[in-house]
């Protein structure tokens, strides 16, 4: 019993957590805990945990797990229903009730006294009832149903006693007492729970306890005798027999008064409004009787009557003792805890009721149809609960990742209203500590829903504190190297923002668009304060004006990132750095001037200052050498013109004379004959007598050509021909045959004109 109550308490706690939590990991954890618990059909019917789990069927992460768990519990409920005694047909139950009433009327008509009724079975004797009241209900064994194996026709037909039976001999049917359907029938809401149960389920006789003299404090009458009791009240008391005791008359009249005083409620009244009134009526009925306290055996059917109401509808299940499902049994008095334990023992010890729903279920198909009808049942919450439900739903939607439309919200509310009524009501009744914890967890979930990025204004606040003293001590920095928060925050993914991130420890969550894949562009390690300061001074060399007596090894990480011109500008303020930075200039020399060789007796600083002017010096030397080389070279061929002072002749006369001079040349000897003298010329060459007639033709041509010819080109060719003739004369060489042939062809060509 303790294990069952522990399981029930654990299921209720997990149910509340499933209704309040939204994180997938926690939901999966709670579902795993529920699957590990030893679940029974009674716990499922009492808590409604299956419908709470079914609401998670369409969840993105735990939907499959919740669907499998709900299906497994459904099989558990179906197997439990099949193992229980099958439900009876309503028509069959009504016929059995009519048969019992007719049998009692026949016994009264025969004149059977109260103490001379047929012998009862041991289970229906008063001694057995007193023993059963002292024995815990869990140790009692349910009585076998002897009539369930009889055919339907035999159960409907009454058995007639034999004719030779005596006056006080019971009929064969009375030897095996008729049992009414176990469990409560769907009684009217206004009736008392005690009248809704038959005594066959409690191990009692068909007649009320008051008729048999039992000291019961409640006048319990069978629900099947509702119509017959009204007829008995209208009859005179003497017509019912003279053997009835005054106690019987008093008990019946009391029961009739209770039925008349109880107002009839409509059949659609909620269980919340009906069950507290039933509980009060039970107390009043107990006080109207012998004044004894109502035992747990008489209150147990009430709890069994509530289970089908909970499994059929999604209304909140009110407990008789006011127990909060979220708090378990905490905060109850010892008497209430004892009464609650007695109720649970009675529920587990008694055989389960047959009618779990308001409509009888006869097959597995009907069970599935009822289950499908439950899923699409219209919500019937009160106005106050609808207001509370909407507020909780709005809070949950604020923490969600995406907002849905109003139409989607209405559909989701209509589908989830039946499963969330109990969970939200139980969550509303949590203690204040748990409410504060749930609010903190919801706030944490809302924070975790978004991307976990550090806002940029946090870093801007850090640099706002340092802006004043930085401006007081350092020179104004450039816009690209500024570290103040005046710049507008840009997107983290922009490359400009990454370049302008002056603070080295600033985390950049942007991703580089690289072909090899997206990688986070952030530093692997957080830099130290010294590294951050060195980075700032390296990016802002103008801010470091005077270092004073700071050792070089402190400034070395800063100076390594400076350019040579920046080092040169810092020389005027820090003369001590000139000797120390010689090694840095050496590195710059090797980087910028790879082919230069250092000169002796010169520092690397002087070397670097000289090397930028070396290319210009080499260019000037090269230009001077080229110019001197061109001046010393001899001149090449020169074209000179000979100008003759002569009168221009007509082109016709010039062409004629050229032809004549060409014809006078001797092709064999290569000599040119002198031209004919003009008539009347008295001028005689001076050298004509000294040299041979043909031999002196060249000199005569040179003398007379300026006067006779106007073509300067021809005269120049003749001048060159004269020394050639002398050379040939001295050499006495013979003209080549091809040359002679060419000359002859040339002569013939011009002679044809």
From Swiss-Prot:
Its annotated compartments are:
Nucleus
GO biological-process terms attached to the record: regulation of DNA-templated transcription elongation; transcription by RNA polymerase II; transcription elongation by RNA polymerase II
Acidic residues: which segments have biased composition?
Answer: 366-377
Q: Where is this region: Interacting with Elongin BC complex?
A: 528-537
Annotated region (Disordered), positions in chain: 80-245, 261-453, 477-497, 650-735
Phenotype for residue 498 to Q: In a colorectal cancer sample; somatic mutation
Q: Where is this region: BC-box?
A: 528-537
Compositional bias (Basic residues)? 306-317
| Transcription listed as a keyword | yes
TFIIS N-terminal domain boundaries: 5-80
Main location as per UniProt: nucleus
Residue ranges, compositional bias (Basic and acidic residues): 147-157, 271-285, 333-348, 409-428, 654-663
- Keyword Transcription on entry: yes
Q: Which SUPFAM superfamilies match?
A: Conserved domain common to transcription factors TFIIS, elongin A, CRSP70
* Region described as Activation domain: spans on this chain: 500-659
Q: Name one GO cellular component term.
A: nucleoplasm
* Compositional bias ranges of the Low complexity kind: 680-700
Q: What is known of its domains?
A: The BC-box, which mediates binding to the elongin BC complex, has the consensus sequence [APST]-L-x(3)-C-x(3)-[AILV].
Quaternary structure, per UniProt, is: Heterotrimer of an A (ELOA, ELOA2 or ELOA3P), ELOB and ELOC subunit.
The protein here is known as: Elongin-A2
């Amino acid at each position: 019993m303790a294990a069952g109550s522990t399981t029930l308490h654990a299921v209720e706690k997990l149910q509340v957590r499933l209704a309040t939590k939204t994180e997938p990991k926690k939901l999966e954890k709670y579902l795993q805990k529920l699957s590990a618990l030893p679940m029974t059909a009674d716990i499922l019917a009492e808590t409604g945990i299956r419908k709470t789990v079914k609401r998670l069927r369409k969840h993105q992460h735990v939907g499959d797990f919740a669907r499998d768990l709900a299906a497994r519990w459904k099989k558990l409920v179906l197997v439990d229903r099949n193992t229980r005694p099958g439900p009876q047909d309503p028509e069959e139950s009504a016929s059995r009730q009519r048969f019992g009433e007719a049998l009692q009327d026949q016994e009264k008509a025969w004149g059977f006294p109260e103490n001379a009724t047929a012998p009862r079975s041991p289970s229906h004797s008063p001694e057995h009832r007193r023993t059963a009241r002292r024995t815990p209900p869990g140790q009692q064994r349910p009585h076998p149903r002897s009539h369930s194996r009889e055919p339907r026709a035999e159960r409907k037909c009454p058995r007639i006693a034999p004719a030779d039976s005596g006056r006080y001999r019971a009929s064969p049917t009375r030897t095996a007492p008729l049992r009414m359907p176990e469990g409560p029938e769907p009684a009217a809401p206004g009736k008392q729970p005690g009248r809704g149960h038959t005594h066959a389920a409690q191990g009692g006789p068909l007649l009320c306890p008051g008729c048999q003299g039992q000291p019961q404090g409640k006048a319990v009458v069978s629900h099947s005798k509702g119509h017959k009791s009204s007829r008995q009240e209208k009859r005179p008391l003497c017509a019912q027999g003279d053997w009835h005791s005054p106690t019987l008359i008093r008990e019946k009249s009391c029961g009739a008064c209770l039925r008349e005083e109880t107002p009839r409620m409509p059949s659609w009244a909620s269980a919340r409004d009906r069950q507290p009134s039933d509980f009060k009526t039970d107390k009043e009925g107990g006080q109207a009787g012998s004044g004894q306290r109502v035992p747990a055996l008489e209150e147990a059917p009430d709890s069994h009557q509530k289970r089908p109401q909970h499994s059929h509808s999604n209304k909140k299940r009110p407990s008789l003792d006011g127990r909060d499902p979220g708090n378990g049994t905490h905060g109850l008095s010892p008497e209430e805890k004892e009464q609650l334990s007695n109720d649970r023992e009675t529920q587990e010890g008694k055989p389960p009721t047959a009618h779990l729903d308001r409509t009888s279920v006869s097959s597995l198909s009907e069970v599935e149809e009822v289950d499908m009808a439950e899923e699409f049942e219209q919500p019937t919450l009160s106005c106050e609960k609808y207001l509370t439900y909407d507020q909780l739903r709005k809070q949950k939607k604020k923490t969600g990742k995406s907002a849905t439309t109003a139409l989607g919200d209405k559909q989701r509310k209509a589908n989830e209203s039946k499963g969330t009524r109990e969970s939200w009501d139980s969550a509303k009744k949590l203690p204040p500590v748990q409410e504060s914890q749930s609010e903190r967890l919801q706030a944490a979930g809302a924070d975790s829903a978004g991307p976990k990025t550090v806002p940029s204004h946090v870093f801007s606040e850090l640099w706002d504190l340092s802006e004043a003293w930085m401006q007081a001590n350092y020179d104004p920095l450039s816009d690209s190297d500024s570290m103040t928060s005046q710049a507008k925050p840009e997107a983290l993914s922009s490359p400009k923002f990454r370049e302008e991130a002056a603070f080295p420890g600033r985390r950049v969550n942007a991703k580089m668009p690289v072909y090899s894949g997206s990688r986070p562009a952030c530093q692997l390690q957080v830099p130290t304060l010294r590294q951050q300061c060195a980075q700032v001074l390296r990016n802002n060399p103008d801010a470091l004006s005077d270092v004073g007596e700071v050792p070089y090894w402190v400034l070395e990480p800063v100076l390594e990132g400076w350019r040579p011109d920046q080092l040169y500008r810092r020389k005027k303020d820090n003369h001590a750095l000139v000797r120390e930075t010689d090694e840095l200039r050496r590195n710059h020399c090797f980087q910028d001037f790879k082919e230069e060789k250092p000169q002796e007796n010169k520092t690397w600083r002087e070397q670097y200052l000289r090397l930028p002017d070396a290319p210009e010096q080499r260019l000037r030397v090269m230009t001077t050498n080229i110019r001197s080389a061109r001046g010393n070279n001899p001149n090449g061929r020169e074209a000179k013109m000979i100008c003759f002072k002569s009168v221009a002749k007509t082109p016709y006369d010039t062409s004629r004379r050229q032809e004549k001079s060409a014809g006078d040349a001797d092709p064999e000897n290569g000599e040119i004959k002198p031209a004919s003298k003009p008539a009347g010329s008295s001028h005689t060459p001076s050298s004509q007598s000294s040299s041979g007639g043909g031999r002196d033709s060249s000199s005569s041509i040179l003398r007379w050509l300026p006067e006779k010819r106007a073509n300067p080109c021809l005269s120049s060719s003749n001048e060159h021909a004269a020394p050639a003739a002398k050379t040939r004369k001295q050499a006495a060489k013979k003209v080549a045959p091809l040359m002679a042939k060419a000359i002859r062809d040339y002569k013939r060509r011009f002679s044809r004109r």
